[in-house]
């Protein structure tokens, strides 16, 4: 996880939605670990480097325009997710596509199928 939030807030959020069992604390990257926050690519480049990931084989799931821009700036494919906590009804999916998302969905169940296509 790469976020512009604090590590404690990220972990609290994961616990609230019962996703904390999927992420170890060392897999949570907060803005204070990098020089520049999103939309700069720093956080995603750090995640890729520290986890020995190949950018071409990595897909980021983002719920904000600024996060999508960070992924694009890092050279990593990104899926826009509109059911996230930052999603507001007045925001158009078009914004996420224009920011560089390869696909936009509001359905958790579609993410696996989208990833398989890329």
Per-range role (PLM):
Residues 6-118:
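Asp-based, Mg2+/Mn2+-dependent phosphohydrolase catalytic module
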